[in-house]
Amino acid sequence: MKFVSIISNSRMLFLFLLITAKSDRESCLYIFDENIRGVNITPTFVSTRAKGLFDLFIKKLRSRVALSFFLLKRKIKLEETIVYGADHLSHSLLFLKKCSFFLIEDGTENYHQKSYKRSWKNKLFSIPKFGMYKNVKRIYLTKRENVPDCIKSKVEYINIKDLWFKKTEEEKLEILYLLGIDMKKIQLLIGEPFILFTQPLSEDYILTENEKIELYKSIIDKYDASKLVIKPHPREKTDYSRIFPNVKVFDETYPSEVLDILEVKFSRVITLFSTAAFSYPKEKVDFYGTKIHPKLLAKFGNIEYE
């Protein structure tokens, strides 16, 4: 049996490492989104993002040819392959059509009703994503609220802390190494009262860069800057240390949930609607939600910490 991992972000990689056994990963084929960096895993393929329909068509064609050649050369049979990860990247389609697929949560996308709506063009020229396709056997989610009815029968709810504590000390150290965790930098966060988890809203073309900065400025102004740490999303390119010189910025690229499992405590967790906040008790979270900006509400619908 061959294992393939198609990973769209560092958090998904973290969940994959928690869900699977070390023995299953020893000969695993990794396919990463182009934005994943700072980890100690070398992917076999990198999935680049398309900049339009024609570019998407070309990228899908190239990835299919390259993958088919690789699988043929290595004598890998898709019918005997199990895939974990994302079903919406350019490299996913070939595996989704022929393999048993185990979908892993991709942030808040899995909880938006809009992710599951299909246009007539999508129905004609594509296959359903986010776990709706017949070959998706299971969907791993970390939150029970707002799960769309169309996928509920496939969902297995997982708890990050429970999975972490079930690992041996050797397995924990390996996971931290693979994620590129620098424990010395983690230690610098101990004693900091507030943390702000930001999101790649301009990088995903939901807000302009100026709109994103102004939005976060309006939030940061409500807190004592000397007690605040900004934890940017791994895909963000915004230089928060330049924009907010009086605020400490923790710009390591690994997922925010790592801080929780390593028992780095904060008296206040602040976010718009990052899934990182769901690792913390509701009473400690300032969850501003999507209603704070009309573009966020239009794109994602109403997201609250329920």
From Swiss-Prot:
Domain of life, source organism: Bacteria
Species this chain originates from: Haemophilus influenzae (strain ATCC 51907 / DSM 11121 / KW20 / Rd)
Protein name: Uncharacterized protein HI_0871
Pfam families: Glyco_transf_52
